[in-house]
Amino acid sequence: MYFFDKHPNFKAHTLFEDDCGQAATYETWYAHADELGGIMPSRSLAAIVCRNTIGSALSYLCCLQRRVVPLLLDEAMDDELKQGLLAAYRPEFIFCPHGTEGGKPLYSLYDYDVYRHNNTSPALYEDLGLLLTTSGSTGSPKLVRLSYDNIQSNAASIAQYLELTAADRPVSSLPMHYTFGLSVINSHVLCGAAECLTTATVFDAAFWKFCKEKRVTSIAGVPFTYECLRRLKFTAMELPDLTLMIQAGGKLSKKLQKEFGQYAAGTGKRFVVMYGQTEATARMSYLPPADCLRKIGSIGVAIPGGSFRILDDDHAELTEPNAIGELCYDGPNVSLGYAHGADDLQLGDERHGRLLTGDLAYCDEDGFYYIAGRKKRFVKIMGKRVNMDEVEQLFKNAFADRDFACTGGDDDLLVFTTAPETDCSDLEDFLVAKAGLHPSCFTIRSVAAIPKNSSGKTQYTDLPGLKD
């Protein structure tokens, strides 16, 4: 039995409470799933335009229970990019907020409606359970294919090492289309717990009022979230019911890890640093709270059921302490592989439980792992993984007469362009609109030329040294 199947012992439990005074029980979910079963055949494909509301979260859980494969999309994604994804994957059904689609819906649940989007669904692999985007809001057609066992095993591991129970009450501090935010739902549903859903952000007074009213017990955040919490003087807030803070979605600065680790230790709370990727469903490692201040900068140890190895360039294992190589993860939560279009949805398991993370790492003498850098060209922007090659392509597709190149680090994307300085403001607006990135997290610089080698490939290592 999976956590998203019917559990008789949970029927009367509250599943979701929102900031509009509404609530849903597990029995409510089961009833909606039964109704949808008469409308949507199992093994069909359904897109869900996600936001942190009861209707959106129920849509996801109903799909899992009916064995309908959900494709989760960010509500804030640019409409042109969203339509491109829908055209590439041809979902038979679409769940979306009230009033965003024309015509009469097939079914409604809370603030969401279900519509038929295509006459049929593409062929689906028998164990395919979920499709997630890989790069935030850039509209890349590349999706991660997850199996039901992937979803179940990762939820169970997270619940185990975080010691979750039915009494826990997390707040939706991250979007549900994002693998980290979704894992909070999954791991708590597995325990019969309730999640408190709000569309407010940590910057809103309403968010903290909601946390107090609902007696929230845990909060999840990416490094940017914790930067914001520091500025908001979170450690001085009165949140007596909050007992757990979790972090993933990029490397947290040592200063912040120490600050929040000390706060947790001094107030009887737990602060847990973690590491994961969408390709591993969500989580691959965690740093036990007892080691938070002893192992500053570490991503910790592999989650229950998983294991790490450090590999050299020839994929031979490096066993000596502190040797840097590519981090390789083995576990039941490793995804089936990627999809680039509807035809790929019938592919089987291409990874067989092993993931080369693309991150360079080392293991210390005590068995704790540390990320040293990246092999691949992606960065984390406010916790969202952004592929710099895809950002370049976005610009090049829209501004064919200009050249572009991207470099940078987490929350510090640098876009170099041959467009004149006077156009940089328009380019900034374009990136905000198309990719949903906050202007504080990227810089656009005008240069005379993008450095290339003799074969025409961009010399990225030369970019940071360019002068205007």
Regions from the PLM with identified roles:
Residues 35-76, 173-174, 385:
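Conserved AMP-binding/adenylate-forming
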